[in-house]
Design a protein with these regions (language model features):
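Glycine-rich phosphate/pyrophosphate-handling loop used in enzymes and phosphotransfer proteins
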Residues: 1-234
């Protein structure tokens, strides 16, 4: 087996234990695995941001000021997000390979830890909804990375009639532009989510606007609660 990131051969240490016990298949070598920055320690109880990365003046107890502003200034209900990795330079490079270079096989690297994170925080959700790409973006890429991540979870993935209008890439916009922009998401169909706890799945949580734009539509259609599971927290 070769590492999906660097293509180096992955060797296994042979012992009596490995002779009798089936090893889990590895998709990444030890050297590349060290590049993955897992979120550990204290986090914002809402958005999951590592609190050690937040200056003291930008947090109030165990909540960051971004989440407080979303509730107090923007009027959005509190929303729980949990992420697996810090969106640092190493993860940016890996996600670029995953998303923009069309390497969908990289989802295998994240399958088990992403699934474990789900089971830790969201075992009681009703359904998972991946964030859609616009038709143009999905055609360019050949797949939707959020759908691949959602397929890792032991829960029904609901591919709804939720659609996304083609807009400028979020990564090219400043925070203020993202928050003040028009909601690009809409439902084509008549799906309802009466009293359901809906989990939105995406690759990166940065400002939180995407999940709240979709969340507002879900609440309008009867959802009891909306949460979010993402691969990385920016």
């Amino acid at each position: 087996m070769h590492c999906l990131l660097c293509d180096e051969y992955i060797s296994y240490a042979i012992s009596w234990y490995t002779f009798f016990v089936k090893l889990h298949k590895k998709y990444i070598c030890d050297r590349c695995e060290q590049k993955l920055s897992y979120i550990l320690g204290d986090i914002c109880k809402e958005c999951g941001r590592p609190l050690e990365l937040v200056p003291a003046e930008y947090k109030n107890g165990d909540i960051c000021m971004d989440c407080i502003r979303w509730t107090n200034e923007q009027g959005f209900p509190s929303l729980i997000n949990r992420s697996l990795h810090v969106y640092d330079e190493g993860m940016k490079e890996i996600l670029a390979q995953f998303k923009f270079r069309g390497d969908a096989e990289l989802v295998h690297i994240f399958h088990q830890p992403f699934r474990s994170l789900f089971q830790k925080y969201f075992a009681n959700v009703s359904v998972a909804i991946p964030v859609p790409l616009s038709e143009e973006r999905e055609y360019e890429r050949g797949f939707n990375q959020a759908e691949l991540l959602a397929s890792c979870l032991p829960i029904k993935m609901f591919c709804t009639s939720l659609r996304r209008i083609e807009t400028e890439k979020q990564s090219k916009k400043k925070r203020k532009e993202r928050i003040s922009g028009v909601n690009p998401f809409y439902f084509q169909g008549e799906e309802m989510f009466h009293e359901q706890h809906v989990l939105i799945v995406d690759d990166v949580y940065t400002t939180g606007i995407t999940v709240r734009q979709i969340g507002s539509l879900l609440y309008d259609r009867g959802a009891r609660e909306v949460s979010c599971l993402t691969l990385c927290r920016g």
